[in-house]
Amino acid sequence: MDTVTVLNELRAQFLRVCPEKDQMKRIIKPYIPVDEFNTEQCLDSSIRELYMNSDGVSLLPELESPPVSKDFMENYASLGKMRIMRENEGQKGKANQNLIGAEKTERDEEETRNLQDKSAKNTLIVEENGTLRYNPLNSSASNSLLNDDDHTSGKHHKTSSKEDSYLNSSMEMQKKSSKRSSLPFVRIFKSRRDHSNTSGNKNVMNTTNTRAKSSTLHPPGARHNKKGSKFDMNFDFDENLEEEDDDDDDDEEGDDIHSQFFQLDDDFDAKGSGASPAHKGINGMSNNKNNTYTNNRNSISILDDRESSNGNIGSASRLKSHFPTSQKGKIFLTDNKNDGQKSDSLNANKGIHGDGSSASGNGSVSRDGLTETESNNISDMESYINEKDLDDLNFDTVTSNINKTVSDLGGHESTNDGTAVMNRDSKDSRSNSNEFNAQNRDRITPGSSYGKSLLGSEYSEERYSNNDSSTMESGEMSLDSDMQTNTIPSHSIPMSMQKYGIYHGDDDSTLNNVFDKAVLTMNSSRHPKERRDTVISGKEPTSLTSSNRKFSVSSNLTSTRSPLLRGHGRTSSTASSEHMKAPKVSDSVLHRARKSTLTLKQDHSQPSVPSSVHKSSKEGNILIEKTTDYLVSKPKASQLSNMFNKKKKRTNTNSVDVLEYFSFVCGDKVPNYESMGLEIYIQASKKYKRNSFTTKVRKSSTIFEVIGFALFLYSTEKKPDNFEEDGLTVEDISNPNNFSLKIVDEDGEPFEDNFGKLDRKSTIQSISDSEVVLCKVDDAEKSQNEIETPLPFETGGGLMDASTLDANSSHDTTDGTINQLSFYKPIIGNEDDIDKTNGSKIIDVTVYLYPNVNPKFNYTTISVLVTSHINDILVKYCKMKNMDPNEYALKVLGKNYILDLNDTVLRLDGINKVELISKKDARELHLEKMKPDLKKPVLPTIQSNDLTPLTLEPLNSYLKADAGGAVAAIPENTKVTSKAKKISTKYKLGLAKQHSSSSVASGSVSTAGGLANGNGFFKNKNSSKSSLHGTLQFHNINRSQSTMEHTPDTPNGVGDNFQDLFTGAYHKYKVWRRQQMSFINKHERTLAIDGDYIYIVPPEGRIHWHDNVKTKSLHISQVVLVKKSKRVPEHFKIFVRREGQDDIKRYYFEAVSGQECTEIVTRLQNLLSAYRMNHK
């Protein structure tokens, strides 16, 4: 479907749905081929059907607007130019009347009005029936009139100077007015300058004779004679309303700015109107009958324009070389269709007249029609162009039109002949060119304002001052310097690589890549063969001479060269004409210029360009160098080597440094209630035998650890000045087993014999006295101490293996506690192992690599602290293997669960075996992350006496399992099919079904998978009572690994067996009693559950001496209600009925956390339900 049909469909659709008839009538009718009849019968049948309504009635008669004119838009710019020219000439003439005498104005008034009548007759656009149409009769008449003027001027060269000056002034005013013709909305590009009055006065003074003749072209009232059609494309926009408020000089300066912004040539527009003073003064043998002569002159105006000023090299056009061709330029090229001989004769005539220029004697006017002030006031924005504004222009057919024009210019003569003719012109003009350059060198700005003002280009004066090194004359100019296809740059990147450079900052690597890629893309889009066809003479003209002009013409000719020469490249001409053999720049000069212009790129570590690339620019070679000098990563040290070196360093250090191991005994960094002060004497020391030193130690530390810490202080902080003479040697104090700790007698001496000697494995808080003394032991007692408390380190400094410690004393247990199994596996060994490691709290975690095909060999052991997180295991393993920990995760061995890296090592529940799996594989296997463990309490209670982050000190509650334990092998694939719903109280207590070992073996409950061998360590749940005798049944192994979903309503007690409810299990919690009327609304208390009794007691060791707090004892039968608050998860209440009374006592408590509050309420409710069932 073509565009015409689509547009008519839109018009017809609007006609049908338009609610306003007046607005509907203003829709423009479709194009009617025959304008005289103006009837719908001339329309195409398909288009006529679109304007039929549902009743079959045509909508076209209702339209009041005239039909679309075919040639209206093509000639609309000319109409706007003629209109603006008449208005502005009258306005400028009014401004110039103040500087010119009244006598001269009256003398020229009659001649001016005659010229106005002539220009009115030459109007190319006429209005007929409300439609603007092109009039070919007036066009031919205009051309014949112009040719007659040329013929007359050719015959009479000695006419009066007044008449010649008048012709020049009229063309100058047309130049000024034609600058407005590029845009109908002239106020869009209006610009104000503070110095507009000054520059305007200078321009008036420089062109006094010119402006004087044209001051009365139009009277002042001519500005208001605007005649527009009913449906004008300006949308009734009146320039006069805007311009009346501005000064006259401001308008004059604004006209120059419009032309400077778009880089339009004055002569180019003037010749488009059919009048040029250069041709009037040069061509005396023109043909005034043929219209093609004018068209030929317009099409070759790019070449003619070069010789319009003193024969200087190239005043080709003020179109910037990177500025795309305008619509008018395309019309001039496409109109040229025949009569190429007259083009050649035109060149010959101009060659005869040599420098033929009607303004050769004017020293204050520059070569392209600008005064000196106007040349200095060129806008800095002249090299910019908005790409979106030119999207509607079509540049696809310019290449073919250029080729056609070049072929038409050649005519019946060969290209070489045409070149020879133009070369003769160049010879005649070379001498005048040097003279002109010498006069105007100071006021001509080298290069383009794009490189000067916007990029701060560093140009060399040597490049522009050497006129003798010119290797390119006007005859070798190419048409495609101005008429060029595909020249719209992307985001204003200049297409020419000659005068423009991209200047770099400190870090422009990304910018370089983007610009280089853009330049390569634009250069590769051109075809060199097509470009060589458009060149008249000379394939690669250089920029050494064309750079003397304000507006470069040949800058676009070098765009086919390598982009590595961006901004400063030079080439040598390959023309074969005789005059091209003029003295050229030597190779050394070219090399020096190249070096100076490419210095900036080399400073930024860009690949240097060899000279061969500069010389072979025709071939378009591109040098691309790949950077391969990447930073080589240093090899990381081997883990095994680090272990050996560490061992070596530890061996060479002082043996006293190993006592630093006992520094953890210091009680300065723990709360006061967890530490105690000691006054320590040293019997064998001269300084501390009578004078003790004071320190603070942890209450939970053993006597052996206190001995080691005292020796550490003696060797560091409390070290005497004369250590060698004090009585102890380094070998003595390096081993704590050489000493024992005793209580001091009243006279300051230790008790004799074994009285007062403290047990090495008991805690320091068991003694009631704070004064102790270190005494040396004999060899027999030292040997006994070595067996009882072996050193956790070697004398050389290395830590001993845990298996060595276990082998030393695993054959015997010293606490005499019973061997007992429980539901929970501890994360470290039994209490003997704990005492032997002296609180090191380090466990080994085995990490397997997924898939675990060979578990006997494919594993790595990582040692971490009990308080560390699972993320620490992953980080240590990845650091050891030089892997990225962000790409891996840890999963439970044999389970489809991903461990949460924020959980502690306690989540492993003693099964210290994990698998390393990549996150990609985990996503493919759809592994789920383990849910938070809400069942186990995380705060210190009697029940939760395992090692948690807040309870780091284990009690005597870890026993070894019997060889024939009651733990049966349970398959790992057994799962609980029932999901955790709202479990009833009976099911919580386990009363509905009693579990047995057989049911456990059959898979009624889930297991952790790691207790199948029955040789693990288990937690003794009843650590305060000895009421549990015999073998316990196995219940709910590894609840954290269970597949049951737990909610806050199903805490730790859910799913447990209820035997602890009847066997005197003891639980203790820290709570706060809330009293609203008290001065302090919260008081700390300890809530203890012991069998059937509930105790509310004051906190241990943290009550003030003047507080009188009673201990309240409640039986479970007195409890009326135990309920958790719904609004605050930490709050709960207990209602109790007092004995012998009917009133109810209410207790409101606040637990440490919501989980512990749920645990307390659940235990009390279970205990209350069990008591009521047994006492029905």
Curated annotation (Swiss-Prot):
<dbReference type="GO" id="GO:0005546">
    <property type="term" value="F:phosphatidylinositol-4,5-bisphosphate binding"/>
</dbReference>
<dbReference type="InterPro" id="IPR011993">
    <property type="entry name" value="PH-like_dom_sf"/>
</dbReference>
<keyword id="KW-0926">Vacuole</keyword>
<feature type="compositionally biased region" description="Polar residues">
    <location>
        <begin position="540"/>
        <end position="562"/>
    </location>
</feature>
<feature type="compositionally biased region" description="Polar residues">
    <location>
        <begin position="197"/>
        <end position="217"/>
    </location>
</feature>
<dbReference type="GO" id="GO:0030950">
    <property type="term" value="P:establishment or maintenance of actin cytoskeleton polarity"/>
</dbReference>
<keyword id="KW-0597">Phosphoprotein</keyword>
<feature type="modified residue" description="Phosphoserine">
    <location>
        <position position="400"/>
    </location>
</feature>
<feature type="region of interest" description="Disordered">
    <location>
        <begin position="405"/>
        <end position="490"/>
    </location>
</feature>
<dbReference type="Pfam" id="PF16979">
    <property type="entry name" value="SIN1_PH"/>
</dbReference>
<feature type="compositionally biased region" description="Polar residues">
    <location>
        <begin position="481"/>
        <end position="490"/>
    </location>
</feature>
<feature type="modified residue" description="Phosphoserine">
    <location>
        <position position="509"/>
    </location>
</feature>
<dbReference type="InterPro" id="IPR008828">
    <property type="entry name" value="Sin1/Avo1"/>
</dbReference>
<keyword id="KW-0472">Membrane</keyword>
<keyword id="KW-0007">Acetylation</keyword>
<dbReference type="GO" id="GO:0038203">
    <property type="term" value="P:TORC2 signaling"/>
</dbReference>
<dbReference type="InterPro" id="IPR056385">
    <property type="entry name" value="UBL_AVO1/Sin1"/>
</dbReference>
<feature type="compositionally biased region" description="Low complexity">
    <location>
        <begin position="605"/>
        <end position="614"/>
    </location>
</feature>
<dbReference type="GO" id="GO:0031929">
    <property type="term" value="P:TOR signaling"/>
</dbReference>
<feature type="modified residue" description="Phosphothreonine">
    <location>
        <position position="510"/>
    </location>
</feature>
<feature type="modified residue" description="Phosphoserine">
    <location>
        <position position="140"/>
    </location>
</feature>
<comment type="function">
    <text>Component of TORC2, which regulates cell cycle-dependent polarization of the actin-cytoskeleton and cell wall integrity. TORC2 controls polarity of the actin cytoskeleton, which is required for orienting the secretory pathway toward discrete growth sites, via the RHO1/PKC1/MAPK cell integrity pathway.</text>
</comment>
<comment type="similarity">
    <text>Belongs to the SIN1 family.</text>
</comment>
<feature type="modified residue" description="N-acetylmethionine">
    <location>
        <position position="1"/>
    </location>
</feature>
<feature type="modified residue" description="Phosphoserine">
    <location>
        <position position="144"/>
    </location>
</feature>
<feature type="region of interest" description="Disordered">
    <location>
        <begin position="267"/>
        <end position="378"/>
    </location>
</feature>
<feature type="region of interest" description="Disordered">
    <location>
        <begin position="87"/>
        <end position="233"/>
    </location>
</feature>
<dbReference type="Pfam" id="PF16978">
    <property type="entry name" value="CRIM"/>
</dbReference>
<dbReference type="InterPro" id="IPR031313">
    <property type="entry name" value="Sin1_PH_dom"/>
</dbReference>
<dbReference type="Pfam" id="PF23164">
    <property type="entry name" value="UBL_AVO1"/>
</dbReference>
<feature type="compositionally biased region" description="Basic and acidic residues">
    <location>
        <begin position="103"/>
        <end position="120"/>
    </location>
</feature>
<dbReference type="GO" id="GO:0005737">
    <property type="term" value="C:cytoplasm"/>
</dbReference>
<dbReference type="GO" id="GO:0005886">
    <property type="term" value="C:plasma membrane"/>
</dbReference>
<feature type="compositionally biased region" description="Low complexity">
    <location>
        <begin position="283"/>
        <end position="298"/>
    </location>
</feature>
<feature type="domain" description="CRIM">
    <location>
        <begin position="638"/>
        <end position="786"/>
    </location>
</feature>
<feature type="modified residue" description="Phosphoserine">
    <location>
        <position position="552"/>
    </location>
</feature>
<feature type="domain" description="SIN1-type PH">
    <location>
        <begin position="1065"/>
        <end position="1169"/>
    </location>
</feature>
<protein>
    <recommendedName>
        <fullName>Target of rapamycin complex 2 subunit AVO1</fullName>
    </recommendedName>
</protein>
<keyword id="KW-1003">Cell membrane</keyword>
<dbReference type="GO" id="GO:0005774">
    <property type="term" value="C:vacuolar membrane"/>
</dbReference>
<dbReference type="InterPro" id="IPR031567">
    <property type="entry name" value="CRIM_dom"/>
</dbReference>
<feature type="compositionally biased region" description="Low complexity">
    <location>
        <begin position="137"/>
        <end position="146"/>
    </location>
</feature>
